[in-house]
Structures are given as structure tokens and as C-alpha cells.
């Protein structure tokens, strides 16, 4: 794979088809598609000529699974290029460097994969160690906001060709943060302090004059950022899996777990990880990072796990997930009363969510949520308004 594959017209076409998934209804996407062949030709020519530049990104806040995030999204024309670049260069170059148990944002992997691998490790650890073992669960603070560009680019320099590296460097450069409002002292220390994109968005635009920029942070809405987020701490993965030979280790984006028999050895590994995170500019969330006995309740990717004496696993959906869905049901009901959605639409939304979590051992809470849905929509259904 090379840059020729990136600006290949067929690959740009495929990039558009993937980039439009789920957003075909947007005006910008429809306008781009109305002149699709011409747009692909112009994009291809600009990349070949070296005149291609990204357009200004759109920023907005998104509440995802209870977390408010500042999202940066490229224009559709840039998403097409990035999709082709990621599929034909970035992923093929970086995927061989990743461990198998790094489970986010890649084909044939994802949330279910991360949970299945954790459950497999939990069972194997119980068979090998019994109940006399410990687990470290670790989380990073504002992970994407604090990925340092220079260190990220240094990693990619070893795996990308010169023209690929130059193209990727341009993508990363567009994510730098305007910090003109900082004093000279604050600016000199900004790389060593936790950056929060949500708080940065509250600062008046008049203070962001372009006088000072911070080479840190990647926008969550970009696929290149997602791939880079997986790759950035890969040396920690290699250290734990290869150097230390830890069998029961896994990572999902900024969440990590390690299962070991000896607590002191586990604490020593954690100390080494802290040092490596410090070198990378990654900040560990001390409140969410803990070492506990393997027999207690363990939370991983919003599922609560507990080992049974028989070696089986109890799996319960986290309470916050049910609270969030209850609020969503009430929102669906309000939209239904205003005529924005139909009863069948609300029902399909709920059934889709329910199908994801019915496999877990939370039957009682699911029944209560079923009753909540039926209670809110019963009157309208009985009145024949379900269509």
C-alpha cells in the first residue's frame, strides 16, 4: 500500500461510500454526492499536485454514554480522503504492531470483542490461579485531549513512508490547539498539564488570536484520531505482553486491565506503566484506577463481573446504563407526544437497546424497564396511536 492507493479513484469512491454511512440524510453529504465524480476527480488531482488541504472542522458537544465530549468533525470531502488514507495506509501499517487484545475501532473487533476477551481471561486466570489473584483496572484522564503530536509523529515515522508521513503530519497539524490566552508561564508548562477540550471550548473566541498553539489533542470525530488513539500507547501493551509475559492483559482504547497472582508484582508493573505514561504525556485517572482481589465485583466496559466459586461468571449491566436508558425512554415518549416519532419507532429503539443487554444477568432490572416503557406508552397504544 502507498499514497497511490490513497488517491486511486476507486478507493476514493469506496471511501465516500463508507464515510456517508449513517449520514446520507445530511445536506452536505447529498451536495457532495450530486457531483460525486467531479469531486473525486478534484480531490485526486489536489493530492497528486500537493495542493490538498483540509477544510475547517466543525466542533460540537456530544453526550455519549453519560460522558460529555468535545467533537471535531471534518467536512465530507476530507472524510472521504481520510477514509481512503486510513484503509489503505494507516491501518495496514499499524495493525501488525498491535497486540491481539487491543480491541477497539478495528474490523472484527469492538466493544463485544473487548468484553469477550476479558471474560476469557477471567475464566483462565481463575483456573490457573484459583481465587488467590489480583486485578488492576486502569483508566486515562482526558486521553484524546492530551495525545502529544510530536511523540505521536515520532512513532509513525518508523512505520510510514516519507510521502505518507508528510500527509499524516498535515492531518495531525490541523488538530493543534489555539492557546493564545495563556500567559508565557502557562504556555511553557501546558504540555505537562491536563488539557480539557470542554473547558477550552468555553473560552471566548476573541482570545484565540493564533499567537500561540499547543501541539496536543486529537479530535474524537476523526477516524485517523481513533486509529492513532489505539496505536499511541502500544509500547505499554508490548511491555506488558512481551517483556513481562503477562497473559491476562487487555486494553480497550483508554481502559486497561491486568490479572496477576502476586499483588507486589502487579504493583511493580503498575509503577512501570506510570513511568511510561509520564514519558508519553498520558495522565492516569487515579480515582478509577485500582487493584482489587479477583473475588470481588469488577467493572469492565460498563459490565459488572463476579467470579462464582464454581468458576462461572456473574455478569450484570452497570446501573448507570439502566438510568440512562430510562431517561431515553422518557425522551422518546415526549417526542412521540409531540408527533416527532411514531410508537413503532420508539419501540424499535428500545428493542434494539434491549437486545444488546438481554444476554447479561440483569433480568430483574430489564423487567422494570419493560414496565416503564409499557406504562408510558400504554394509553396511546390502547387509543390506537401506535402506528
Name each model-derived stretch.
Residues 68-99, 211-241:
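Conserved pre-motif C helix in the palm subdomain of viral-like polymerases
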Residues 1-42, 383-387:
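Non-catalytic, polymerase-adjacent accessory regions of viral genome-replication enzymes
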Residues 2, 86-148:
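Active-site-proximal segment of RNA-dependent polymerases
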Residues 160, 274-282:
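A common structural junction motif
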Residues 74, 79, 83, 200-215, ...:
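Right-hand nucleic-acid polymerase module
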